Amino acid sequence: MSPIILLSIVLQIACGVHVVRTGRPMYWLFILLFFSYIAVLIYFIAEILPDMRNGPGSRKVARKVRDVIDPGRDKRRAEINLQLSDTQANRRELAAESLRHGDYQRAAELYQGSLKGLYATDPDLMLGLARAQFGMGQPQQARDTLDALIAANPDFRSKEGHLLYARTVEDIGDVAAALHEYEAVVQGYPGEEARVRYGLLLKRTGDSRRAADIFREILTRSAASPKYYQREQRDWIETARQELSRL
């Protein structure tokens, strides 16, 4: 027998034993059985490496791999947790997973159901509800929720929430307010999305010179940034490059 095939069998068996002993999902056995070295590599990255190096980077990689193999896994787990125990924490978890999977209706129901009693004005819950409403194509309701959040929690700060507010007023058609909000949120926003959206709105309003300045700033900033940042922001950087070429 070829040494390569023999090594593959040994690794598959070792990973299979790990699946059974550690209580991993049984679908891993079928993946390991049919996909040889590729399956072993994926299993190592998704299930073994996080245990060896329980850092945020490892967890992020593992989650990406699991999302490709079984995209609904975390949401199903959150559903089960809520069925077993209807707690505020479990509602938040399922609401967040529903948002992540684009199930905005379910997320909105969970957030609305959680906004009561001591949590009636919880800023994180209100922001989650606004995100769900915006995802359902309800920018006015999202803006109303964000306005209520601001009124109830004047000291609350969230860059993502601020960007969402800018997007809601833009979608409603309040261009002047949207420009004002985008101009404010781009200051210190951790990424290029806010700047790209600001540039696109400036372009639509006819301010091509200012839009070009924003897109150039994005390209200059990203060129001087670390490689990981360029990878994470690749889509927004490419949008800025294309839009600048059209001006």
What are these regions (language model features)?
Residues A96, R100, Q112-G188, E193:
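Alpha-helical adaptor scaffolds
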Residues S8-I9, R53-S58, P71, S85-R92, ...:
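Generic helix N-cap/helix-start motif at coil->alpha-helix transitions
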Residues P71, Q88, Y104-Q105, P139, ...:
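TPR-repeat structural position
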Residues M1-L84, R106-E109, G113-Y119:
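Long, contiguous interaction/recruitment modules in multidomain scaffold/adaptor proteins
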Residues R131-A132, K159-D171, G199-G206, K227-L247:
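TPR/TPR-like alpha-solenoid helical repeat scaffolds
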Residues A62-R66, A95, A130, A166, ...:
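Conserved small-residue packing positions in alpha-helical repeats and bundles
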Residues V186-Y189, K203-S225:
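TPR/TPR-like (Sel1-like) alpha-helical repeat modules
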